[in-house]
């Protein structure tokens, strides 16, 4: 996110690297590091968060590649994404995992995104169906509709669960 200027020129300084040196971190660092962790530790739980994950938690327009990309949880092959500040959700996740709960059951936490192929356990009154990834990549109107629904559901006190199908036959629940 911090590597390029608005005109897509590479920055020589990196405020988030020790000493401010540029060119120390890869582009799309969350994706790269998650994939490396998955390769080194195939059975480990991969949790992602921070500014990059928060901004890309749902399907989004990617300025660098000039296209709509899937949620970063898909590209990073992560198990759970925590968005926003995350100070509360990280404690809840740590306590749940420490108690022996499998990460696939951490679907009840506010401020998280998880992948699933089954939304049957969700109460229809508790979620909003976003246009599918397929729809938003082919229709600007559907992209705008999805963005509006996301925007109207950012307040964690009143927001509903946002469900987005990657394709019409493959469900992903973005919370």
Indicate where each model-derived feature is located.
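A solvent-exposed, charged loop/short amphipathic helix patch at secondary-structure junctions
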Residues: 1-25
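Generic structural signal for well-ordered alpha-helices
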Residues: 31-38, 94
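Short beta-strand/loop segments at the ligand-binding rim of alpha/beta enzyme cores
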Residues: 41-48
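Short, glycine/polar-rich helix-capping loops at beta-to-alpha or helix-loop-helix junctions
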Residues: 50, 58-72
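Conserved, mostly hydrophobic/aromatic
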Residues: 79
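Two-component system phosphotransfer/interaction surface
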Residues: 85-98
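Extended catalytic-interface subdomain
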Residues: 117-165
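Conserved small/polar residues in nucleotide/adenosyl-binding loops
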Residues: 167-172
């Amino acid at each position: 996110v911090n590597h390029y200027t608005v005109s897509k020129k590479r920055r020589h300084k990196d405020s988030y690297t020790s000493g401010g040196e540029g060119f120390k971190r890869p582009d799309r660092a969350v994706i790269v590091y998650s994939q490396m962790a998955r390769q080194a530790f195939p059975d480990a739980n991969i949790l992602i968060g921070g500014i990059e994950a928060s901004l890309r938690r749902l399907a989004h327009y990617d300025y660098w590649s000039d296209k709509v990309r899937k949620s970063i949880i898909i590209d990073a092959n992560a198990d759970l994404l925590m968005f926003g500040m995350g100070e509360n959700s990280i404690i809840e996740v740590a306590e749940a995992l420490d108690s022996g709960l499998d990460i696939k059951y951490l679907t009840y936490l506010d401020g998280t995104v998880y992948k699933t192929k089954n939304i049957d356990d969700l109460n229809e009154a508790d979620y909003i169906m976003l246009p599918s990834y397929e729809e938003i990549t082919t229709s600007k109107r559907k992209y705008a509709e999805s963005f509006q629904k996301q925007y109207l559901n950012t307040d964690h006190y009143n927001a509903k669960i946002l469900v987005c199908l990657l394709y019409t036959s493959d469900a992903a629940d973005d919370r």
